[in-house]
Amino acid sequence: MAGMKEIRGKIKSVQNTRKITKAMEMVAASKMRRAQERMRAARPYAEKVRAIAAHMSRANPEYRHPFMVANEGVKTAGMILVTTDKGLCGGLNTNVLRASLQKFKELEEKGQKVEATAIGGKGLGFLNRFGAKVISQVVHLGDTPHLDKLIGAVKTQLDLYSEGRLSAVYLAYTRFVNTMKQETVIEQLLPLSSEHFDANDGTPATSWDYIYEPDAQAVVDELLVRYVEALVYQAVAENMASEQSARMVAMKAASDNAKTVISELQLSYNKSRQAAITKELSEIVGGAAAV
């Protein structure tokens, strides 16, 4: 009977755990939908800023913003690492951290040191354990990222690049593909390549004309900063949507596994109970036969 009592305790424990994982699955599903809406809402802003900056760059080919010029001979690179603040989201953080570590090693092999910006507590913890130089950080963003919380940390990297102290700035995050699939991405944020300003939106280069105040150069300077900030914000929004999707899938898998364990424990309990009843009946029959 002690075995049956122990099994009942295990069943109760797993049932309680399943209630928690099921609740977390539903919460993650709700947050995922909101995160996807924010992610989609951020895309038109970044695209419109890109289109305007592209038009102005074509209209003023003689001016090259520092973000569009490679800093040759510099032995330090920047890395903006976007992760989550919380765990329980499958291998999402592990994948981006592994890819970032590989990028660190590649840069070191080329004689490049790395100065990192951490967005998210998991990435900050990784960088500290790895011994990387962290020059800025943002943690505890919550479920709704705000650009004003990111600007300070991101500006540190942008200023260093503008001053010619970084050879490049890389952005590492998890891109949202769909609920079941997320991709680890490490892309070059600075210097901006010509791909950022290709006329792929179907708008002819001569289709608009503006009067720029105070002058076109000042507007380009401000626009490119806003564009890079929008790229980072988009990466954070994509990462948050990926986080909630991965957490929902992980919690669903945990709930399904708990259900399987409960079924197996219930079967063990029934077998133990049947064995105990059979033993009691055998003892009764044996006692009656002895009489």
Curated annotation (Swiss-Prot):
PROSITE patterns assigned to the protein according to its UniProt record, in alphabetical order: ATPASE_GAMMA
Keywords for this protein: ATP synthesis, Cell inner membrane, Cell membrane, CF(1), Hydrogen ion transport, Ion transport, Membrane, Transport
Signal peptide boundaries: none
Membrane topology: Peripheral membrane protein
Protein's job: Produces ATP from ADP in the presence of a proton gradient across the membrane. The gamma chain is believed to be important in regulating ATPase activity and the flow of protons through the CF(0) complex.
Family note: Belongs to the ATPase gamma chain family.
Protein name: ATP synthase gamma chain
Source organism of this protein record: Burkholderia thailandensis (strain ATCC 700388 / DSM 13276 / CCUG 48851 / CIP 106301 / E264)
Gene name per UniProt: atpG
